[in-house]
Swiss-Prot record:
Subunit description: Homodimer.
One GO BP: biotin biosynthetic process
Gene: bioB
SUPFAM superfamilies, sorted: Radical SAM enzymes
NCBIfam families, alphabetized: bioB
Naturally occurring in which organism (per UniProt): Chlorobium phaeobacteroides (strain DSM 266 / SMG 266 / 2430)
Residues binding [2Fe-2S] cluster: 152, 213, 283
Matching CDD domains: Radical_SAM (cd01335)
Domain of life: Bacteria
Keywords noted in UniProt: 2Fe-2S, 4Fe-4S, Biotin biosynthesis, Iron, Iron-sulfur, Metal-binding, S-adenosyl-L-methionine, Transferase
Protein EC: 2.8.1.6
Name of the protein in question: Biotin synthase
Amino acid sequence: MRPVPLHPDILQAYAVLETGEPVCRELAFALGELHGPDVLDLASLAHKVKLRHGGSSGSIHACSIMNARSGVCSENCRFCAQSAHHQAAIDVYGLVDVDAVLFHARQTASEGISHFGIVTSGFGYKTLSKEFRQILAMIDRLHQELPDLEICASLGVLGEEPALELARHGIAQYNINIQVAPRRYGELIADTHSVDDRIDTIKRLRRNNIDVCCGGIIGVGEQMKERVEMIFAFADLDVSVIPLNILVPIDGTPLEGSPGIPLDDIVKTFALCRLVHPRKIIKIAAGRETVMKDFQGLLMLSGADGLLTGGYLTTRGRATADDRMFMRQLQWFN
């Protein structure tokens, strides 16, 4: 039996493996149209590129987050249960105290997870408000109590002074997602603010030498070509970590009952992200357990080298102990 040849576009993309240079837009758009067994060939290439050039040096970058203020958000992001514009049934509370943050951070450190993120609902902090100063005090306390734990934050849109203060207080990474191709943000995500608010925040953070964790969400009504546009937008913003979320439709939000996204499209998105970003950390976030289910390991073999463990903001995740076993098993493919 004759061997089945690789698709010509995949053969062309193998240059990334040799050079470490990203594929061009034209080739990325073409690869996004692959179907059937060719998708697995694409995934295999992305996995090889990750192992040779990836940002996590062959290991898996794991992080855990804490929802430090929940709900009553002024923004109308269509997928989000925390928006005050929607009717999702979630826990609502103000900023938690430092003892609650320390409890979760200690648990994260005890489980061998290197990065811990403080996340708050809301538009963000344009000035050094009383609440923002409370968060800075939390960060200082975490550094004192857990000096080996990398402290991260996701606090929404930031003004110049808050961004500078986060740098002064030693934040390791800041998460703020552009979510989709920028030109479709207002239509697919929110119209109470603009994607430029987020992009300006990213630029402020980078000016202050803070590493940025910036990703998106797939399955909100975008097309594959627009996922490719989003992936290239990450390159323009000089981000360090790219978390990709898969929509988990939540009752009470505008996207409840969404039909979902084909699994091969998800695999292609992760693989293309790796081929465009050979050296970045690419992380699986929401949807890993609930959407991918039995196939979540496939994403780790399609270019991803990071994951969010221990749960999400308003949806359950998987126990960290189970994820540690998952990460050990994945080493067989390195």
